[in-house]
């Protein structure tokens, strides 16, 4: 694809997929198409946040008639700046994805970053950052999803409680995600939480310090229990 000022995000993503069609199996190609479709949704939803005032006005006018205006208006130089949002938030919070698609999200991001650089749409630094982020996501997104499932299973064993009757010292995580501070076999320690959460060994094997977990913990008879759990965000 020759680089021209008129190449849009949408056109670049289509050209990337066209190149992949020549070399990928049908099943793998479907994963690529699914990931690129999700990336488009992410770009259209969150990309405008990075626009300066004149560009944002232009986008707002176009958006009135076209919800995908961001990808139709702006060039591919905007793609890689959204990779962290896409892999770190969007794929976790907004997408019900299986292990295969979660792994593919990182792989496709790496391939796309290299392709954008080869075609003159991204600099070396942007490519390197996106490739690194993609490699980490391929490994960590499936792990984080498995950990979230294990914590959810653990929450099912916690009896219903009257939150109003709990001391503020005995309930944490209602307002903000908790960050894993350290991991020991069968134990997760969270920042600003006094004492460990005991978990199955499989869960502690998956977890990593620095990951954020949307989770509510309650302390009963000196032991932390999982009351509710949402997502695990690898960092």
Which residues does each PLM region occupy?
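Generic N-terminal leader/targeting and pre-domain segments
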Residues: 1-20
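Flexible glycine-rich surface loops and low-complexity tracts that mediate binding to linear polymers
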Residues: 114, 205-231
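Beta-strand/loop nucleic-acid-binding surfaces
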Residues: 192-209
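Structural detector for short beta-strands of small beta-barrel domains
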Residues: 151-185
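Short, charged hinge/linker segments at domain and secondary-structure junctions
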Residues: 51-60, 118-149
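Non-catalytic DNA-binding core/recognition domains of DNA-processing enzymes
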Residues: 25-117
